[in-house]
């Protein structure tokens, strides 16, 4: 057999160079720890570069974690004892949307429930954190809970206190009541669009609904989604890759819903969480947070810290 030492040496050299210059595999995102105490985050958001945002139900602060770093205070909210529920990052509009709540009256030291709230949909610059916009919800008391962006760029908001969905059309200066349904939506919480269709959940009844939309943009009658197994206390809800991800706050679980028509197969992804309320899928990672509201209700439970956002790998 004739040998070709020059060719063999060239191949060997090429293989060696390939081994040297192959980029190392990118490390999977790690869990995020919040560098503050008593945060009690109700919602989280994420951007494609791996930045994570979260609000606080106890402090007037929105936190941010840059990729592979812990979360630190980022935005200090102005107003009357403001706190944050839903947050949503909108890279297209370069906006971080947040549901900001303020008490209507001072809390009573003997009251077992918080005072009535008024709330706002507030927009912040996604890079600097500067306030860009502020839209009050209709009514003397209300409860902005979560946010989603429609295909036409309208911003939809759930009003848990009034069983309503509100809409902010592109270019509009005010939120409008899009749907009010006390029979099905008394307890409306999370929402998201999937394949152009709007889905919402009811944290009290543990139902998922599809909200039909007429050609002229009006709301139809909610359609109850048939689930392959029960869920318990659906809260934060986000969709990506044809799947809806849900935080089950009473169930202590994170679940995935794969829809076929108006039926959904439920797959549990993570268990053992303390009142999970926020999810944010981004690429191959599902971010999920614990609110630990049980510690707010019962101080005898002790120290709730630290608060974390978990990075759950997706297939």
Question: What is the meaning of each model-derived region?
Answer:
Residues 280-315:
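Blade-level signature of beta-propeller repeat domains, shared across WD40, Kelch, NHL, RCC1
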Residues 66-70, 125-130, 169-173, 212-217, ...:
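Short loop/turn segments that connect beta-strands within beta-propeller blades
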Residues 112-152:
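Asp-box/WD-like beta-propeller blade repeats and closely related beta-sheet repeat scaffolds
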Residues 60-62, 105-106, 121, 163-166, ...:
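Structural signal for beta-propeller blades
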Residues 29-34, 71-77, 130-137, 174-182, ...:
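A short beta-strand motif characteristic of beta-propeller blades
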Residues 99-116, 291-304:
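Short, conserved, GDST-rich strand-edge loop motifs in beta-rich repeat architectures
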Residues 57, 101-103, 160-162, 203, ...:
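Short loop/turn segments immediately following the C-termini of beta-strands
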